[in-house]
C-alpha cells in the first residue's frame, strides 16, 4: 500500500506544471511540438451545455477552439490571461453579441474565426487590440451593414470572409481601401494578395456598387475573391443578375435644370409649375411653399427618356392667396438641391375700346410692340412672348414651355391665304367646322373636322378672353378632333382657334363663345322638358282614371244583372223550331240571350243542337 502511494506521488511530481490541474473539465487539452522546437497547447471545448467560456484555460494556450456550444456572449477581457494565444476559433455557437474588450491582451492573435453564429453587429474597434490579426472569418452571421469607420481597422487583414450575411452594400471607404493596397511593407517582387468572401449576400444593385463591380472585373490586381459570381437581389428588375452583366452609373448628386423663375397667371385660371432635375440615383422631387402654407394643387411625377425626373404642380382656379414663392426640391442620398419659382396672380384685364363696326370687335395693344386684333381680315398668330417686337417666322414655331403665348396679327389677302405663304391651301384649310358642343361655367368642349388629317397630324387649340392679347395653348394628341378646355371664368366671352400645330389659324377656324350662353340654353331646354312632361302627366292622368272607372262600373253592372236574372222567375217567349230542307229540326237562326234560357231540370240548350230520336221528329218546349 505504501509502495503504491509512493508511486503515485512520484508521478504527480513528474507531471509538467503547465498541465497540472489547468485543463477545464468540459474541454480537452493537447500539447504539440512545433518545428522550431517550441511547444504549442491546443484547448478544444465542444460541450453543448456550455453557456460561458471556461475560466481556467491554461495561460500557455496558443490555440483555443470553442465550437458547437450554447455560448451566447463573451464577457469583456475573458481571454486577457491568454497572452500567447494565436488562434481563437468560436465557430457554430449561439453568439449574438461580442464585448468590445474581448480581444484585450491578445497581442499575438493572428486568426479570429466566428462563422455560423448569430452576430448582427461586430465590435470593429476591438481589432485595435490585435495588431497582428490577419484572418477574420464572419461567414454565416446576420451582419446587415459594415460601418465606414471599419475600413481603418481592416487594413492589415489578408483574409476577410463576409459571405452568407445580410449585406446589401459596402461603404465606399472600405472599397477604396481595397482598391489602393500599398505594397511597401511586402518584400520586393511580392505583391500583396487580399482574399475576400462576399458571396451569398442580398446585394442591392445601384450606383453604390459601382466600384465593387469594377473590383470584381479585375480592376485591383492585388485582390482575390473566394467567389467572383456575385448576384443582385434587388431591385426586382435585377434580381438574379450577375455583377458581370451590370452596367451601373456612378452616383451623382441632384442637379436642377434651370427654368423660369416667375410665372404669371390670371385670376381663376390654372397655373402649372414645372421643375426638372437629374441625378444618380434619380432624385425624389417635392414641392413646398416658402411661407409654410399648404399646397392647393396636385403634383404629378414623370421621368423622361433621357433620365430626367420632372415634377409638375397644377394649381386650378388660382386666387391671390396662391401668389408667392414655391420651392422645388430634388433629393437623393448624396444631398439635396432647391430652386424657387414665383407665382404672380393678376386680375383679368377688361377691354375698354368698343366700336359698333365688325372691324373693331377685338383690339388691344401690348407693351414692346406686341398687339392682337380680330376682325374680318385679321387672324391671330401665336409666338412665344419676347421683349422685342414679334416678327413672322419662316419655319414652324418651336413649342415653348410657357403656357402664356402672345398674338401677332397680320393681313390676309382676298383669297384668304396667309401673306407669308408658309403653308399651302390644303394644310391651312385642313381644320373645318369648329363647333362648341358642350359648355359649363368653367369649361368648354370643342369639336372639329379634319378629313385630310393623318394619324400623325397634331393640332393646337388657342384660346383667350375675348379682347385680350394673352392666349393659352392646348396641345391635342394626333388623331383626336375633340378637346375640353377647363379653368375658364364664368359668364365670360372667349375666342378659340384650332389649327395644325405649327401653322397660323385662319378666320374660319376660330369660334367665339360665352361660358354662360350654352349653359343657360341647356338650362332652358331642361326647363322646357320638365314643363312638357308635367303637362303630359296632368292631361294623361285624368283620362287614365276615367277609363279605369268606366271599366270598373261596367264590370259591376254585369255582375249585378247576372245575380238578378238567376234569382227571378220570369215567363219567356219560346222560339219555335224551324224545319230544315233535309227534314231535320234545327233551332232558328236567332240569337239566344242569357235571358232566353229556360229554367228547368232539362234545359232547352241541351236540345238546341236537337235532333232525331227514334226516327221521329221531336218538338219539346219547357216552361
Swiss-Prot record:
Record's GO cellular component, any one?
A: endoplasmic reticulum membrane
Positions of the LRRNT domain: 22-59
The chain positions of domain Fibronectin type-III read 430-518
Where located? Answer: Endoplasmic reticulum membrane; Cell projection, Dendrite
In this entry, the parts of the chain located on the Lumenal side of the membrane are: 22-526
BP GO terms, sorted: phototransduction; synaptic signaling; visual perception
Transmembrane residue ranges: 527-547
Name the source's superkingdom.
Answer: Eukaryota
Glycan attachment points = 156, 296, 455
State the LRR repeat positions: 60-81, 84-105, 108-129, 132-153, 156-177, 571-594
Q: How does it sit in the membrane?
A: Single-pass type I membrane protein
Please give the name of this protein.
Leucine-rich repeat, immunoglobulin-like domain and transmembrane domain-containing protein 1
User: Which key words tag this protein in UniProt?
Assistant: Cell projection, Disulfide bond, Endoplasmic reticulum, Glycoprotein, Immunoglobulin domain, Leucine-rich repeat, Membrane, Repeat, Sensory transduction, Signal, Transmembrane, Transmembrane helix, Vision
Cell membrane in keyword set: no
**Domain Ig-like C2-type as annotated: residue spans:** 266-335
Protein's gene: LRIT1
Q: Which cysteines are joined by disulfide bonds?
A: 275-328
The source organism is Homo sapiens
Q: What function does the entry list? A: Photoreceptor synaptic protein essential for normal vision. Involved in synapse formation in cone photoreceptor cells.
Extract the Pfam families matched here: I-set (PF07679), LRR_8 (PF13855)
Q: Which residues form the signal peptide?
A: 1-21
Work out whether the entry's keyword set contains Glycoprotein: yes
Amino acid at each position: 500500500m505504501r509502495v503504491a502511494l509512493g508511486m503515485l506521488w512520484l508521478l504527480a511530481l513528474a507531471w509538467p506544471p503547465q498541465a497540472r490541474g489547468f485543463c477545464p473539465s468540459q474541454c480537452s487539452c493537447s500539447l504539440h511540438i512545433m518545428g522550431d522546437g517550441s511547444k504549442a497547447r491546443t484547448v478544444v471545448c465542444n460541450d453543448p451545455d456550455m453557456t460561458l467560456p471556461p475560466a481556467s484555460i491554461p495561460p500557455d494556450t496558443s490555440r483555443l477552439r470553442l465550437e458547437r456550444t450554447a455560448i451566447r456572449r463573451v464577457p469583456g477581457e475573458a481571454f486577457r490571461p491568454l497572452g500567447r494565444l494565436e488562434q481563437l476559433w468560436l465557430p457554430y455557437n449561439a453568439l449574438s453579441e461580442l464585448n468590445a474588450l474581448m480581444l484585450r491582451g491578445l497581442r499575438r492573435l493572428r486568426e479570429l474565426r466566428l462563422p455560423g453564429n448569430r452576430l448582427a453587429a461586430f465590435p470593429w474597434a476591438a481589432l485595435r487590440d490585435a495588431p497582428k490579426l490577419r484572418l477574420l472569418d464572419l461567414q454565416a452571421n446576420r451582419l446587415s451593414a459594415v460601418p465606414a469607420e471599419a475600413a481603418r481597422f481592416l487594413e492589415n487583414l489578408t483574409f476577410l470572409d463576409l459571405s452568407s450575411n445580410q449585406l446589401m452594400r459596402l461603404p465606399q471607404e472600405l472599397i477604396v481601401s481595397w482598391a489602393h493596397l500599398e505594397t511597401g511593407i511586402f518584400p520586393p517582387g511580392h505583391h500583396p494578395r487580399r482574399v475576400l468572401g462576399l458571396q451569398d449576400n442580398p446585394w442591392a444593385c445601384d450606383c453604390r456598387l459601382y466600384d465593387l463591380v469594377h473590383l470584381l472585373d479585375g480592376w485591383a490586381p492585388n485582390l482575390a475573391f473566394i467567389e467572383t459570381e456575385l448576384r443582385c437581389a434587388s431591385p426586382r428588375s435585377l434580381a438574379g443578375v450577375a455583377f458581370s452583366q451590370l452596367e451601373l452609373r456612378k452616383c451623382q448628386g441632384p442637379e436642377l435644370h434651370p427654368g423660369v423663375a416667375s410665372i404669371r397667371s390670371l385670376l381663376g385660371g390654372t397655373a402649372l409649375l414645372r421643375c426638372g432635375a437629374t441625378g444618380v440615383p434619380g432624385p425624389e422631387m417635392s414641392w413646398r411653399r416658402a411661407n409654410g402654407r399648404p399646397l392647393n394643387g396636385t403634383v404629378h411625377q414623370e421621368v423622361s427618356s433621357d433620365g430626367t425626373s420632372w415634377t409638375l404642380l397644377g394649381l386650378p382656379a388660382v386666387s391671390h392667396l396662391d401668389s408667392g414663392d414655391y420651392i422645388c426640391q430634388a433629393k437623393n442620398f448624396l444631398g439635396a438641391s432647391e430652386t424657387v419659382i414665383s407665382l404672380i396672380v393678376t386680375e383679368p384685364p377688361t377691354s375698354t375700346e368698343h366700336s359698333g363696326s365688325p372691324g373693331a370687335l377685338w383690339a388691344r395693344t401690348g407693351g414692346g410692340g406686341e398687339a392682337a386684333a380680330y376682325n374680318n381680315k385679321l387672324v391671330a398668330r401665336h409666338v412665344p412672348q419676347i421683349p422685342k417686337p414679334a416678327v413672322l417666322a419662316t419655319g414652324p414655331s418651336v413649342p415653348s414651355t410657357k403656357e402664356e403665348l402672345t398674338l401677332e396679327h397680320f393681313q390676309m389677302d382676298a383669297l384668304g391665304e396667309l401673306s407669308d405663304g408658309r403653308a399651302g391651301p390644303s394644310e391651312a384649310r385642313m381644320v373645318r367646322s369648329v363647333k362648341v358642343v358642350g359648355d359649363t361655367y368653367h369649361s368648354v368642349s370643342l369639336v372639329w373636322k379634319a378629313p385630310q388629317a393623318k394619324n400623325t397630324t397634331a393640332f393646337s387649340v388657342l384660346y383667350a378672353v375675348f379682347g385680350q392679347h394673352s392666349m393659352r395653348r392646348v396641345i391635342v394628341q394626333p388623331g383626336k378632333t375633340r378637346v375640353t378646355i377647363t379653368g375658364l371664368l364664368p359668364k365670360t366671352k372667349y375666342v378659340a382657334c384650332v389649327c395644325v400645330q405649327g401653322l397660323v389659324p385662319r378666320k374660319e377656324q376660330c369660334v367665339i363663345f360665352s361660358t354662360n350662353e350654352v349653359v343657360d340654353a341647356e338650362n332652358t331646354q331642361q326647363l322646357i322638358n320638365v314643363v312638357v312632361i308635367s303637362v303630359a302627366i296632368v292631361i294623361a292622368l285624368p283620362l287614365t282614371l276615367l277609363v279605369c272607372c268606366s271599366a270598373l262600373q261596367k264590370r259591376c253592372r254585369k255582375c249585378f244583372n247576372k245575380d238578378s236574372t238567376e234569382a227571378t222567375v220570369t215567363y219567356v217567349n219560346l222560339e219555335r223550331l224551324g224545319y230544315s230542307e233535309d227534314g231535320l229540326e234545327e233551332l232558328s237562326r236567332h240569337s239566344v240571350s242569357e235571358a232566353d234560357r229556360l229554367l228547368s231540370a232539362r234545359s232547352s240548350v241541351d236540345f238546341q243542337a236537337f235532333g232525331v230520336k227514334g226516327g221521329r221528329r221531336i218538338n219539346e218546349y219547357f216552361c
